[in-house]
Amino acid sequence: AGQVAVRVILISQDAANRAWLQGATYRGAVQTGDVMPSGAIAEVLASEDPALAPGDLVYGDIGWQSHAIMPGAALRKVGPHRPLTHHLSLLGVAGKTAYHGLFQAAGIHAGETLLVSAAAGSVGSLVGQLGKLKGARVIGVAGGPEKCAWVRDTLGFDECLDYRDESRP
């Protein structure tokens, strides 16, 4: 597959980006001047790859930059059937982490109780919602009454414990 020139439309900002700055993960540390690795949605401007044409929308590990030239094989077309942001959230790093952590690592089942730390965060919020869809009782842990209210009322968790509430034993 040939090279493709793209213009970035949306980038994903994930908790992993902070860890990548420190080099404490499966990737080497991001150095000054490096492009921050990240999933991104981009528009194809020019293509030497027969599978991609100018105007196509694509997803890939493009990073935090306005434009890039990269192998077409590193990109996948984005279909028009869902909002573009879904490719960076539900289908991005946070969504994949939530899905694999809950179903492959934890193996949650209907009727079980699931405790989710960082329940208001990108991964925790998805873990809790997936747990509810699976039929689990979901208890979130978050910092502050506003976050706990959002976790319960908007995300649908059964309960939320405020770790900042000093009145709790």
Where in this protein do the model-derived segments appear?
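Gly/Ala-rich phosphate-binding loop of Rossmann-like dinucleotide-binding domains
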Residues: A98, G128, K132
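Residue-level detector of flexible, active-site-proximal loop/helix-junction positions
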Residues: A51, A74, R82, P145, ...
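Adenosine-nucleotide cofactor-binding segment
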Residues: K132-P169
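N-terminal Rossmann-fold NAD(P) dinucleotide-binding loop
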Residues: G124-S125
